[in-house]
């Protein structure tokens, strides 16, 4: 039915010259589709009836089989009408149908060109079959099948007439294309010309000649079996193509957009003078390929017509029945011509078969090469698969090893975390101990301040003792002087002075007790400080001062003894010895750093304690090698439990610290003296 509304002058269609007959054809096609929905009213005017979009929605539902949602069946204003048309255009765009210069506003305003373009786009895309076309094809097939050939001459005449008409139409198409190219200078319109395709020409010719042949029984419609066998498909194809090939510019635009042809991509309806961007060489190549395909099809058609002309049947029918070389009642010349034609036909068929055989052999070689290549590729892939399996195995082994390492590291991490927790606990304990020590340090500082006051008091008492000692020394000197004068008066006889000795001992007894009291006070003061307190140095200085005073007394007594050597042992010397014996064993030069009157029979001892940075020195009245640990303990006079280390020379290791445990063990010496370290065993 669309073929009717597209038949007209092509130039008028391109120039938008729509006549009343074409409009009626559009209306008739739309109404023919709307008949499938009896409830829908037929269309009278395309401008008014399709502008609301409802008829278009029904048309899409009929031709496409899809119902549009959201369509207002009774639009009351322009906005609802525009919404319906926009939904129709969205559906068309979803089907990849390109609608150039078509908008919902144009259709709502009644633009006839846009409405016709949309109708043709739907017809070109969905291709609904016309009932009349189907009925015509059915009637033509029935008539053709019922028509049987009469003789070979009639067949030949029909074929000759058909070929002549085809050649005439081809020449017409060439002239029409040339004239149209000169007028419009456009190539894509040439492709859309109704006389472009040879198949279309033959089909058009057969379609045009079929109706008069039915009435006049013309010989142009060949009643041969090949025509009856192929006409069915040819007629159907021609009728389907007739609906869409011969269409105006709107149909051209939609169909070429659907197929994706580059020749009509830039074409716009209403502008026939627009040129394409593609070059003429590409266009000519496409035309040449198209013509080659059409010529191949025409050649096959002519070959079939020739076989039908010579044999009166299809080539496959010839294989089923024997071929008669001589037919009775036929002119020998005609028979010879027919035989030669058959021979030529057989040779051509032989050549075609040879070509097909060579083609099959080439394809077989190609397939064999592809097979070999695939086999080689398969071998390579097998090798690659084996390598991948080996790599996978190695990767799994590495993974297991890494897992084991991870487990080991996790175990070590747990152990470290446990140790860290213990260290944190120890650190907390050390912090608490540090706080306790700080508290003790504050207490010791407080005691130190108290001790400083006690030290001042002791220094004051010491000064008093020094003054008292000086007075007593002066009194002793006076007594010695008086004694000497008295002895000279006695003419050298020494009288018993037991009473004086007793008096001297009586005077020195309190002096010895006072000295012991001072030493006890210093010892208690030293114990009140920590091991590294700087106040120990002050206490050591005080103790050294007291030792110096005692040393001076000892020097004075020594001088007195030397003066009395010539007189023998007098009661005064005996009293002095008794006074010396009344001192404690460790009072002999205690904690002195200098000893000006040390003889060879004494051993100098230098020792360090953990409570003082200053070393102490004492003299022991024994030779080096004879001094024992008991003598050393008696000399330093330290209370409590201690450990004693002495500097010694080892033949194997050199200079070492040797610890002595037993009191009877001899103490090693170092360069003529003894160097010792005294450590408090309770602190360790």
UniProtKB/Swiss-Prot annotation:
Highest taxon listed in the record's lineage: Eukaryota
GO biological processes: canonical Wnt signaling pathway; cell proliferation in forebrain; cerebellar cortex development; cerebral cortex cell migration; cerebral cortex radially oriented cell migration; forebrain ventricular zone progenitor cell division; modification of postsynaptic actin cytoskeleton; negative regulation of neuron differentiation
Record localization: Cell junction, Focal adhesion; Cytoplasm, Cytoskeleton, Stress fiber; Cytoplasm
Residues bearing the modification Phosphoserine: 186, 231, 592
Region described as Actin-binding: 127-300
Keywords: Actin-binding, Cell junction, Coiled coil, Cytoplasm, Cytoskeleton, Developmental protein, Phosphoprotein, Ubl conjugation, Wnt signaling pathway
Listed Low complexity bias regions: 211-228
Processing after translation: Phosphorylated on tyrosine and serine residues.
UniProt keyword Secreted present: no
Residues in Calponin-homology (CH) domain copies: 20-127
One term of GO molecular function: actin binding
Residue span of region Disordered: 207-235, 560-597
SMART domains: CH (SM00033), DAX (SM00021)
Coiled-coil region list: 277-308, 336-461
Domain DIX stretches: 602-682
GO CC list: axon terminus; cytosol; focal adhesion; glutamatergic synapse; neuronal cell body; postsynapse; protein-containing complex; stress fiber
Matching Pfam families: CH, DIX
Segments of skewed composition (Polar residues): 571-597
Domain description: The coiled-coil domain mediates interaction with MAP3K4 and inhibition of AXIN1-mediated JNK activation through MAP3K4. The DIX domain mediates interaction with AXIN1 and inhibition of AXIN1-mediated JNK activation through MAP3K1. Mediates interaction with DVL2; this interaction is required for activation of Wnt signaling.
Family affiliation: Belongs to the DIXDC1 family.
Function, as annotated: Positive effector of the Wnt signaling pathway; activates WNT3A signaling via DVL2. Regulates JNK activation by AXIN1 and DVL2.
Subunit and partners: May bind filamentous actin. Interacts with the complex composed of DVL2 and Rac. Interacts with AXIN1; competes with MAP3K1. Interacts with MAP3K4 preventing MAP3K4 interaction with AXIN1. Directly interacts (via DIX domain) with DVL2 (via DIX domain). Interacts with gamma-tubulin.
PANTHER family registered for this protein in UniProt: DIXIN (PTHR10878:SF22), SEGMENT POLARITY PROTEIN DISHEVELLED (PTHR10878)
Record protein name field: Dixin
Lineage of origin: Eukaryota, Metazoa, Chordata, Craniata, Vertebrata
């Amino acid at each position: 039915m669309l073929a009717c509304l597209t038949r007209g002058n092509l130039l008028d269609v391109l120039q938008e010259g729509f006549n009343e007959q074409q409009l009626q054809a559009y209306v008739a096609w739309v109404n023919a589709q709307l008949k499938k929905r009896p409830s829908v009213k037929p269309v009278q005017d395309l401008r008014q009836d399709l502008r609301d979009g409802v008829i278009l929605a029904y048309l899409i539902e009929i031709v496409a089989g899809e119902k549009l949602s959201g369509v207002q069946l009774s639009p009351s204003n322009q906005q609802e009408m525009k919404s319906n048309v926009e939904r129709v255009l969205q559906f068309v765009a979803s089907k990849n149908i390109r609608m150039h210069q078509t908008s919902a506003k144009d259709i709502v305003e009644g633009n006839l060109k846009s409405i016709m373009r949309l109708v043709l786009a739907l017809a070109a895309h969905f291709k609904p079959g016309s009932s009349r076309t189907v009925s015509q094809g059915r009637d033509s097939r029935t008539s053709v099948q019922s028509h049987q050939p009469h003789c070979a001459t009639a067949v030949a005449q029909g074929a000759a007439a058909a070929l002549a008409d085809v050649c005439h139409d081809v020449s017409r198409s060439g002239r029409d294309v040339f004239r149209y190219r000169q007028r419009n200078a456009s190539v894509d319109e040439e492709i859309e010309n109704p006389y472009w395709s040879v198949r279309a020409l033959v089909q058009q010719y057969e379609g045009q000649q079929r109706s008069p042949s039915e009435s006049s029984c013309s010989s142009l419609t060949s009643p041969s079996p090949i025509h009856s066998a192929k006409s069915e498909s040819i007629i159907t194809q021609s009728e389907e193509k007739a609906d869409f090939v011969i269409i105006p510019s709107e149909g051209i635009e939609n169909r070429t957009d659907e197929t994706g042809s580059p020749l009509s991509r830039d074409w716009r309806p209403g502008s026939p003078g627009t040129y394409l961007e593609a070059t003429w060489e590409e266009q000519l190549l496409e035309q040449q390929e198209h013509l080659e395909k059409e010529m191949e099809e025409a050649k096959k058609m002519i070959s079939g017509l020739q076989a039908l002309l010579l044999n009166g049947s299809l080539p496959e029918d010839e294989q089923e029945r024997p071929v008669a070389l001589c037919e009775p009642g036929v002119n020998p010349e005609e028979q010879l011509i027919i035989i030669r034609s058959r021979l030529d036909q057989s040779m051509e068929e032989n050549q075609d078969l040879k070509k097909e055989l060579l083609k099959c052999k080439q394809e077989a070689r190609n397939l064999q090469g592809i097979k070999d290549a695939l086999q080689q590729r398969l071998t390579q892939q097998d090798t690659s698969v084996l390598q991948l399996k080996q790599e996978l195995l190695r990767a799994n082994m590495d993974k297991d090893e890494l897992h084991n390492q991870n487990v080991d590291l996790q175990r070590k991490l747990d152990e470290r975390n446990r140790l860290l927790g213990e260290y944190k606990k120890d650190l907390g304990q050390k912090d608490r101990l540090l706080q306790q020590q700080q508290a003790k340090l504050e207490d010791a500082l407080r005691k130190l301040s108290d001790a400083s006051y006690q030290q001042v008091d002791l220094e004051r008492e010491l000064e008093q003792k020094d003054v008292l000692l000086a007075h007593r020394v002066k009194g002793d000197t006076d007594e010695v002087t008086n004694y000497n004068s008295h002895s000279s008066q006695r003419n050298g006889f020494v009288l018993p002075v037991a009473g004086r000795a007793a008096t001297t001992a009586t005077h020195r007894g309190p002096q010895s007790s006072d000295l012991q009291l001072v030493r006890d006070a210093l010892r208690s003061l030293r114990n009140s400080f920590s091991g590294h307190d700087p106040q120990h140095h002050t206490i050591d200085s005080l103790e050294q001062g007291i030792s110096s005073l005692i040393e001076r007394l000892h020097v004075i007594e020594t001088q007195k003894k030397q003066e009395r050597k010539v007189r023998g042992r007098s009661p005064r010397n005996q009293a002095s010895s008794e006074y010396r014996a009344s001192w404690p064993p460790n009072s002999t030069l205690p904690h002195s750093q200098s000893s000006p009157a040390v003889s060879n029979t004494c051993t100098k001892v230098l020792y360090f304690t953990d409570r003082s940075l200053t070393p102490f020195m004492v003299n022991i009245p024994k030779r080096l090698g004879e001094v024992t640990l008991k003598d050393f303990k008696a000399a330093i006079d330290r209370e409590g439990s201690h450990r004693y280390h002495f500097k010694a020379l080892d033949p194997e290791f050199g200079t070492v610290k040797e610890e002595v445990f037993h009191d009877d063990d001899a103490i090693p010496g170092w360069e003529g003296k003894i160097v010792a370290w005294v450590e408090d065993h309770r602190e360790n």
